[in-house]
Amino acid sequence: MRGAIAIFGDVHGNLIALETFVAATRGRVSGYVNLGDTVGYGPWPDACVARVRALCGTAKGMIEGNHERLHLGADDLARQTPLVQRFYAHAPSRCRDLTPITGLPLLFDLTRYRCQHAAPEPPARRRYLVGHSHRQGPDPRRPDIIHVGSIGQCRSAINRVEWAEMDLASHDITLHSIPYPVDALMDALRAHHYPAECIDYYARKPRR
């Protein structure tokens, strides 16, 4: 495979943000690796899983995140925050078909980097590309770990879509951040009758 690979994660059922990312990378990258948490929160989990599977080609390029584990019952929803439980109590946040997210790998080795959902504990002597934090950039305490950002729920600016790209010739990592219409997502949450506190989660986040 030549060219560049897009490494992305934390779509969180946000099809609008995912399609913004696809449009930005189409024709520029030759492949995709997904770092997990395709599901959870947003109203389009099944559509997002199908889109990500199509991008990655096979399930090998999709990694299990903690929200896949919540969907599968491998992690206990009762131990999550009340807000997470409110999202999960609302039917559109749930996958109807669990088959595509069952048995996903926990990691994917891409040249000199190991791709996995969250930063490893304890650290290992290698380089990592991770999601989970919903933030982007090198880890301030561990520069061997790069956080690629979040497609569907960026913490630093809720109206941004963030991901990383790796040049397969040089192995250089480039970080990308672009805006998307988050108000359209909130309109969809209202149309799907999400509780007010779920919509407020997006509304009160900073933008740029």
Tell where the protein language model's regions lie, with residue ranges.
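Active-site environment of divalent metal-dependent phosphoester hydrolases
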Residues: 12-17, 40-43, 67-72, 121, ...
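Short active-site oxyanion
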Residues: 4-5, 59-60, 125-127, 172-173
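Beta-strand-turn-beta hairpins that frame and shape the catalytic cleft
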Residues: 1-6, 108-114, 142-144, 171
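Active-site neighborhood of phospho(di)ester-bond hydrolases with catalytic His/Asp-centered motifs
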Residues: 7-9, 32-37, 61-66, 115-116, ...
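N-terminal active-site segment of His-dependent metallophosphoesterases
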Residues: 1-58, 208
